[in-house]
């Protein structure tokens, strides 16, 4: 998550700027949505979340319901995921990519767009036969892995 995708870009939680994580993550998506919502309150996302903290799921749900504002946010997220992922695919050429974290719960509304945009960023040879799947353990993967290691050592 800490490869650079923007020179002098958004501040990341690591203290650097322009990191992939600052753009292609649930946190990055929420930050972008909140920024856009300050100037555009005429949308389904704002109506549904006014007065409470925004979650990535809210954005994906509103996009699935046809909210143009949220669909633009999903396109933004998909583009940055595809940019970073395309760079990694070009270097590593894996057979499978497992996407975890908050964006993994988005479903086809995001992943269909990521797959389409990957053609702009990855070599066609690395996309042949590539599988992109959501992590089955979700956000608990780290905790489950740590528990597994603890039990087996």
List the model feature ranges, each with a label.
Residues 4-11, 16-153:
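ATP-binding/phosphotransfer module of carbohydrate and carboxylate kinases, centering on a glycine-rich
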